[in-house]
């Protein structure tokens, strides 16, 4: 297994505030990597640096490198980066007035990819089937995406993301606003998607991390300066059964968090 994303000595700022400090991490291709740790330790900030969404915040900047297949992410066209590295947010965010069909194809149109309508329909169906949504919506594709349930909306957002064939999918607590049944559906989908995509997921649910991920990176707030730092990174089984760092052990055992 090879590294698709290489994070090297990465420090991220929001103005004068340092959110994460000197993070180095390898993300393996075709795997699911979970980022866990207490609130405020920089997990979501790190995620946003991986497709350059971080830089859209006023005063934001980064030091260090993020390499995508050996190429410096911050030397590439940001539009290209966001095609290669998709993002799924905490709360489902379909375009509420767009139809289900239009939602799936939105990324294609935003990236100005011209494909025949027949091909569009084939792509839409393939993406909806990939997220196990086709059977639930195939007879109402013209209805607004905002009419779907929360779990269906999140799967629609994932269908929209995979329509542009990203190599990496970033997920920022994708189940935090969902009920247990919808959460289970998303977790099953994550395990399915890693066959074609590399996935990085932020989650506060340690049971979820243990269920869906191959690798886990543990973060904490540094005692000096209050910025987030990487504590430990290993195979998920190792993290949850025999962690090497006392901070990791204390976190997964519920002593803080």
Swiss-Prot record:
Family that this chain belongs to: Belongs to the ABC transporter superfamily. Phosphate importer (TC 3.A.1.7) family.
Domain of life of the organism encoding this protein: Bacteria
Name this polypeptide is given: Phosphate import ATP-binding protein PstB
Compartment(s): Cell membrane
Gene Ontology molecular function, alphabetical: ATP binding; ATP hydrolysis activity; ATPase-coupled phosphate ion transmembrane transporter activity
Reactions this protein catalyses: phosphate(out) + ATP + H2O = ADP + 2 phosphate(in) + H(+)
Keyword entries, A-Z: ATP-binding, Cell membrane, Membrane, Nucleotide-binding, Phosphate transport, Translocase, Transport
Gene Ontology BP annotations: phosphate ion transmembrane transport
GO cellular component: plasma membrane
InterPro entries documented for this protein: AAA+_ATPase, ABC_transporter-like_ATP-bd, ABC_transporter-like_CS, P-loop_NTPase, PstB-like
EC number: 7.3.2.1
Record's function text: Part of the ABC transporter complex PstSACB involved in phosphate import. Responsible for energy coupling to the transport system.
Major enzyme class: translocase
